[in-house]
Amino acid sequence: MSVRVAAGPRLHFGFLNLSLARQRLYGSLGVALDEPQVAVSAERAESVVCSHDRAREHVERACHLLDVPGAAVTVESELPAHVGLGSGTQLALAVLAAVARVHGREPGVRAHAPSLGRGGRSGVGVAAFEAGGFVFDAGHPASQFTPERPERGEWTVPPVAARHEIPGDWRFLLVLPDAEPGKAGSEEDDSMRAVVENADPGLADRISSVVTDRVLPAVATGDVDTFGAGVAEVGRLNGAWYAGEQGGVYRPPAGDLVDVLEDTPAVTGAGQSSWGPAVYGVTDRERADAARDAGRRALAEAGVDGEVRVAEPRNVGARIRDD
C-alpha cells in the first residue's frame, strides 16, 4: 500500500506576548492556506529509505516514535524553506502522518510534534496541519519558560484557544522576494532569546486589544476589511519587538513591499509572515487580480525579483490518501 499526504503553508501574523512580565508567553495567530503544497508518499519498508536529507531525519524519528521498522518515503513537492510559510513543520508532520498510515498507526501529530522539534513557541503550524482554518493558540504559562528554548521534546504544543473557518471568498496574496532566508535554527533561537529578554510588556496589552476587538470578531463575522487591518496592526506591533533583530519593523526588503501593498485598495492589510521574507496581503475573490498586480508592482518598485501568487484559505487539515 502507498500513502500520499499533502499539506499547505501557514501564515504567521505574530505573537500576543513576548514579555515574561505577563502570565502567558507567545500565543500566536495565523491561517492555513491551500497552496503551495508539500506532498510526500510512503510505502512500508523494513528500513528507512529516503533520498531527501531533511525528510530522512523525520522518517527516522517517526519510525522511532511509532515503533515501526522503516518506510520508503518520497518528497513529491515541498514548500520554499525558511521564507515564513512554516515549511519545516509541514514537512515533518506530513512525513509522520505518512509513516503512521502505511503501518496502520495513529500519527499522534500533536503529541509527537515536540519530538520532531516542532510546535515549541507557536502552535499555528501544528493546528493548521490538523484542521486548517484561522488559529489563535494559547501560548505557554510564562512561569514555565525562560528566554532559553527548551530541549527537543520537552514541551507541549500550545493548545488552540480559538479556531474559525475562513470565509471561502477570502484570498491571501503571497509575495516571495528573492532575498536571504528568514531566521531558523540556532540563529532564530538567539534572536528570540534577545527579544524575550527585552520585550516591552506594554506592546502585549496593545496587541491583545487588537486581537479581541478586531481580529477575532472580524474572522467570526466574515469582515475581511477589519480582519486585514487587524492582523496588519498585530504584525506592526510585533515588529517593534523584533526591530533590533531584523533591521526594522520588517526585515528588508519586506518593508518596501508592505508599503506598496498598504497603499493598494485591493489589499485590506499587509505584513510579514514570521521572520519573512514572505509578505502577505489580505484580499478577497473580487479583488484578487488587482491584489496580484499590486504584488508584482511591489517587487518591481523594490527592485527585486520574486514570485507572486494568490492563495485560497484551507479549512481542513492535511489530506491523506491511500493510493
PLM-predicted stretches and their roles:
Residues 4, 39, 134-136, 172-174, ...:
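Conserved hydrophobic/aromatic beta-strand scaffold that supports enzyme active sites
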Residues 21-24, 114-265, 286-323:
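ATP-dependent small-molecule kinase catalytic core of the GHMP/sugar-kinase superfamily
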Residues 269-273, 310:
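Short beta-strand
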Residues 1-83, 101-107, 314-323:
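ATP-binding N-lobe of GHMP and related small-molecule kinases
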Residues 248-250, 254, 272-281:
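Small/polar glycine-rich anion-binding or flexible loop at a beta-alpha turn
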